[in-house]
A protein has these predicted regions:
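Glycine- and acidic residue-enriched flexible segments with recurrent GG/GxG motifs
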Residues: 1-289
Length: 289
């Protein structure tokens, strides 16, 4: 891989067929594929069999969509009814939500300039995420004896409530701290600490609302709400060894898994809206009988 490549993968489908995929962080205007003599030299003669080309937004290849003469579509932004179930996977009900926008341009890809990363490292595609793809990120501390965190700046409307959420899963570390950081938020810095192994909160500040939902396979949806005090603010996330201890000796490999960062205007959390380079808006749901 080179340039803006994020990940490459191949799956053996049997009978000599392979499904090959390449993920890039770039504006794509053309896709080229050609026979090759080796890893660096293309051939001018010879042939290969190709089938079922697909270009999509995302960090991993998803199930093939037959597009014929129109674009194939799937996923949470498609105009299809959504059923919400209880924690036991029972008692389904139609999910109807107002229009919401995820204000973060990259909800699943964290290795961008949107995030400042002193003493931490993001590693893309290191675990299976809540959506079933191998597209969760390892969020680990480096080997420094220091504070380990990542932050992103956001543009807000002063006086409005905003809700930030992140999907987290324990790895070598169990704890994560989410901090609505600085004077851009009412009450200045407000933080929550969450144990992704037990599903319980540790040290938390007052003056904010927060909660979590189990997502299965060790994943938890963790969210926190506060009012904006300014038009700009900061969100910080810390991988932690223990509750509320942000400065420690890292080992360069240990951390937690994260997925699906979302910031939305509103006093409560809504369902996940994936973004791949720009803010995305989910239209309001409606139902008539």
């Amino acid at each position: 891989m080179a340039g803006n490549a994020v990940a490459a993968n191949k799956v053996d489908l049997g009978n000599g067929w392979y499904r090959c995929s390449l993920s890039v962080n770039a504006n794509v205007s053309k896709v080229h594929f050609r026979p090759a003599f080796n890893t660096s030299t293309s051939k001018t003669t010879g042939s290969l069999l190709y089938q079922s080309a697909q270009l999509e937004s995302g960090l991993v290849a998803t199930d093939y969509l037959d597009s014929t003469s129109v674009t194939g579509k799937a996923g949470v932004l498609v105009d299809l009814p959504r059923i919400n179930y209880d924690a036991n996977g029972q008692n389904g009900s139609l999910l109807l939500e107002p229009s919401r926008a995820n204000l973060l341009p990259y909800s699943e890809y964290f290795e961008t300039s949107e995030w400042t990363t002193p003493n931490v490292v993001f590693e893309t595609n290191k675990a299976t995420s809540p959506d079933g793809g191998f597209n969760a990120t390892k969020f680990r501390a480096n080997s420094a004896n220091s504070t380990h965190w990542a932050s992103t700046g956001v543009t807000l409307t002063s006086g409005q409530d905003y809700t930030f959420k992140l999907y987290v899963k324990a790895a070598e570390y169990n704890w994560v701290q989410i901090s609505l950081f600085g004077t851009g938020w009412v009450g200045s810095t407000k933080k929550i600490n969450f144990n992704a192994s037990t599903g319980e909160f540790g040290t938390t500040d007052t003056g904010i609302t927060f909660d979590s939902n189990p997502m299965g396979n060790g994943w938890h949806e963790v969210f926190v709400t506060n009012e904006a005090a300014s038009t700009t603010a900061t969100i910080r996330v810390y991988p932690l060894k223990s509750d509320d201890v942000t400065s420690y000796q890292g080992d360069g490999s240990s951390g937690i898994y994260i997925y699906g960062a979302q910031l939305e205007s509103g006093s409560y959390v809504s369902s996940y809206i994936p973004t791949m380079g720009t803010s995305e808006t989910r239209a309001a749901d409606s139902c008539s009988v």
